[in-house]
């Protein structure tokens, strides 16, 4: 982060702030610009790496879940982080069901037919938290090169809508 006159500039790199006054000034600047701030929560780990989940929902169904892993805090796959299989997680069935229900509820609440829901499992709690809702599912290679379930189901839904099954 750098300052140009009276406003902050994005340097397009991750920096860690620890000084509360600097954090407060930056937070005020970000909110003044109309952006949203997220509360920091410590992510659960898988084999020593932080992870969160992208849950791809289609109406009342979960089509795919990808585990996004990183040594750092940011897990986005376009930043060359690792995609792992949902089956690799040792989550209890009740936790899996809860994250599915919350993801579907978020999709419904926003009136979306498709959504990519980012879910964080808080470290040492097994509690899923929705941290972001994206208006499209996702471009997940794990699915594309196996079942291709995400796009196949989207096409079926669209065909159903055009055939009068609204």
Give residue ranges: language-model regions.
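Phosphate-binding site of ATP-dependent enzymes
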Residues: 1-82
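Broad gene-expression machinery/nucleic-acid interaction feature
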Residues: 52-54, 116, 130
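Short, low-complexity Ser/Thr-rich regulatory SLiMs
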Residues: 57-59, 119-123
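C-terminal active-site "lid" helix and adjoining low-complexity regulatory extension at the edge
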Residues: 80-101, 105-114, 121-166
């Amino acid at each position: 982060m750098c300052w140009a006159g009276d406003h902050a500039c994005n340097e397009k790199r991750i920096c860690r702030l620890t000084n509360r006054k600097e954090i407060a000034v930056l937070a005020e600047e970000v909110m003044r610009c109309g952006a949203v701030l997220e509360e920091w929560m410590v992510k659960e780990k898988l084999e020593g790496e932080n992870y969160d989940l992208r849950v791809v929902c289609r109406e009342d169904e979960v089509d795919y879940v990808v585990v996004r892993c990183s040594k750092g805090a940011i897990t986005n796959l376009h930043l060359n982080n690792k995609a792992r299989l949902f089956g690799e997680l040792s989550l209890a069935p009740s936790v899996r069901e809860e994250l599915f229900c919350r993801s579907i509820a978020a999709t419904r609440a926003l009136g979306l037919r498709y959504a990519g829901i980012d879910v964080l499992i808080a470290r040492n709690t097994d509690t899923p938290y929705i941290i972001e809702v994206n208006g499209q599912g996702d471009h997940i290679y794990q699915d594309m090169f196996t079942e291709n379930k995400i796009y196949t189901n989207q096409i079926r839904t669209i065909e159903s809508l055009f055939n009068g099954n609204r």
